[in-house]
Amino acid sequence: IYIMRHKFGYKKLNRTSEHRKALIKNMLNSLIKYEQITTTLPKAKVLKPQADKIITLGKKNNLQNTRALITKLQSTVSANKVKNTLSKRYESRKGGYTRIIKAGFRYGDNSPMAVIEFVDRDVKAKNIDKKTKETNKDKSPNEQIKKEATK
């Protein structure tokens, strides 16, 4: 039996369109920032082609693509990292910038979990962010404000 492929376009993830777009955008920003995130398997499968398209967009370095990156990610920090770091890392690679590794099942609801990460990722990317958080924890909020004001 053959069925017509109507409404087979994309996974809805049981969310409204705006919620789904926001979810994908937030996950893309987290993936770019930390270069590895743990999420459910269906979300990782939706995120993989989106992340690959973002890297491909960043590889063609022109104003139009820069604006498209900023529009898609809603973050100039993430857009700059894609343009300056990730696009240089993957300039010899034609595609397949991310990989999905199955990571068992979540305790509580038994959801299949997965780790999505960039191929040849920078292992230090996650640690750098943790170090800055730890140094900021040690200081009082007033000291942090003074430090930022002197920059």
Regions found by a protein language model. Give the residues of each.
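Structured, basic alpha/beta domains of bacterial-type, RNA-associated proteins
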Residues: I3-T150
